[in-house]
Amino acid sequence: MEVKSVTKYVRISPQKLRGPVDVIKGQKVEDALNLLKFMPLKAAEIIAKALSSAVANAEHNHEMDVDDLRVKNIIVDQGPTLKRFRARARGRGARILKRSSHLTVIVDATV
């Protein structure tokens, strides 16, 4: 049975979030959390939080055993972009795009 956790409007660009995602797809949940714990990236911390939420959902809502869970899929989608303005020379302005992401973590029990 698939269990998912959705984290929306995370203030990090999808490009930065996709790096650690490729490393942990298909891993056992325990191994994935250990890998994420030792990655020196902000994205790894965000993904670990979402993965822990998916595990808690599986354990509490569906009474699944945590030892049997695997990361089936992780989807990173682009969220809304905040547009900002930085003053430049000669009265001009440069646009700054502050991107956000939506993160969906799907875990599945392997038998």
Curated annotation (Swiss-Prot):
Organism, scientific name: Desulforapulum autotrophicum (strain ATCC 43914 / DSM 3382 / VKM B-1955 / HRM2)
Transmembrane segments: none
Protein name: Large ribosomal subunit protein uL22
Keywords, sorted A to Z: Ribonucleoprotein, Ribosomal protein, RNA-binding, rRNA-binding
Domain of life, per lineage: Bacteria
InterPro entries: Ribosomal_uL22, Ribosomal_uL22_bac/chlpt-type, Ribosomal_uL22_bac/org-type, Ribosomal_uL22_CS, Ribosomal_uL22_sf
Keyword S-adenosyl-L-methionine: no
Function (record text): This protein binds specifically to 23S rRNA; its binding is stimulated by other ribosomal proteins, e.g. L4, L17, and L20. It is important during the early stages of 50S assembly. It makes multiple contacts with different domains of the 23S rRNA in the assembled 50S subunit and ribosome. The globular domain of the protein is located near the polypeptide exit tunnel on the outside of the subunit, while an extended beta-hairpin is found that lines the wall of the exit tunnel in the center of the 70S ribosome.
Gene Ontology BP term (one): translation
Family that this chain belongs to: Belongs to the universal ribosomal protein uL22 family.
One GO MF term: rRNA binding
